Curated annotation (Swiss-Prot):
Tagged with keyword Protein biosynthesis: yes
Name of the featured protein: Methionyl-tRNA formyltransferase
Keyword Transferase: yes
NCBIfam families in alphabetical order: fmt
InterPro entries: Fmt, Formyl_trans_C, Formyl_trans_C_sf, Formyl_transf_N, Formyl_transf_N_sf, Formyl_transferase-like_C_sf, GART_AS, Met-tRNA-FMT_C
Known function: Attaches a formyl group to the free amino group of methionyl-tRNA(fMet). The formyl group appears to play a dual role in the initiator identity of N-formylmethionyl-tRNA by promoting its recognition by IF2 and preventing the misappropriation of this tRNA by the elongation apparatus.
Alphabetically ordered keywords of this record: Protein biosynthesis, Transferase
Gene Ontology CC terms, in alphabetical order: cytosol
MF terms (GO), sorted A to Z: methionyl-tRNA formyltransferase activity
Length: 314
């Protein structure tokens, strides 16, 4: 039986681990990030992958830094024939990459060489792509640069969010891995080098990227809101306060007001001008210090007026 070590951390990784177990591989160990404090009470919380591994009685390693010798030697001591990674969250040293008989392969949530990096799902939506997918490739020390083994395309729907696409790609990754590993073991795959001229990056989202730029087109603002839903959530400012924008609809606006200006207030939302003739009707938001709510709830208590401007610094 093939001995596998799985390395992963978030919810995205769980179906991949589960599929390895269901397919009958001997998962001899799971490597995941350390428990972290979560929420206002800072409760120490295990990663979703650790929770799943413990359900199946699989030993769990949680190195703070996998590149340190005493940490990576614990992985090597498991003597895996194959290492599978999916959103592990640390750079893996060459000592691990070179050890397994069948190599170290990664389940990545984009059609490489596009969108290398830690936030490919967010960027696929923020860039308005109509499709993305899963790539399974060999791991190398350089970020997401290894030879491609298999790929599958996944459609991005008009109202797709990062949350819904995350779930679709997670399941697609598990399914593709199930087909890929037997072919890899049988030597039936021809690895394909990535075209370096087509490489793009999807680095982790920084706080300044979360703010809505109302001067962009309505389509770009709409994609921005979808791409940051449900985390970390796009935000703007209104009357000096930060407001998270959970959802908005594209609507036509024939208004020459400045981008960010409220030009119409309706029962279920308010329309904001962008950099072109497609405005955004905000229908779901979250004022600072409050819970997520519909715009109709918000409008019952808020003193909103036509001509007010969003996006001015608090």
């Amino acid at each position: 039986m093939i001995k596998v070590v799985f390395m992963g951390t978030p919810d995205f990784s769980v179906p991949v681990l589960r599929r390895l177990i269901e397919d009958g591989y001997d998962v001899v160990g799971v490597v995941t990030q350390p428990d972290r404090p979560v929420g206002r009470k800072k409760v120490m919380t295990p990663t979703p992958v650790k929770v799943e591994a413990e359900k199946h009685g699989i030993p769990v390693l949680q190195p703070l830094k996998i590149r340190e010798q005493d940490e990576y030697e614990k992985v090597l001591a498991l003597e895996p024939d194959l290492i599978v990674t999916a959103a592990f969250g640390q750079i893996i040293p060459k000592e691990i990459l070179e050890a397994p008989k069948y190599g170290c392969i990664n389940v990545h949530a984009s059609l490489l060489p596009e969108l290398r990096g830690g936030a490919p799902i967010h960027y696929a939506i923020m860039q308005g792509k109509e499709k993305t997918g899963i790539t399974i490739m060999y791991m190398v020390e350089k970020l997401d640069a290894g030879d491609i083994l298999t790929q599958v395309e996944v459609e991005i729907e008009e109202r797709e969010t990062t949350g819904s696409l995350f779930d679709k790609l997670s399941e697609a990754g598990a399914h593709l891995l199930s087909k890929t590993v037997p072919l890899l073991v049988q030597g039936k795959l021809e690895p394909i080098k990535q075209d370096e001229e087509k490489v793009t990056f999807a680095y982790n989202i920084k706080r300044e990227q979360e703010k809505i730029n109302w001067a962009k087109t309505g389509e770009e603002v709409y994609n921005h809101i979808r791409g940051l839903n449900p985390w970390p959530v796009a935000y703007t400012t209104l009357a000096g306060q930060v407001v998270k924008v959970w959802w908005g609809e594209k609507v036509p606006t024939a208004n020459d007001a400045q981008p960010g200006t409220i030009v119409e207030i309706q029962e279920d939302g308010f329309i904001v001008v962008t950099g072109n003739e497609t405005g955004i009707k905000i229908t779901e938001l979250q004022p600072a210090g409050k819970k997520r709510m519909s715009s109709s709830q918000f409008l019952r208590g808020a003193k909103l007026e036509i001509g007010m401007k969003l996006g001015e610094d608090a």
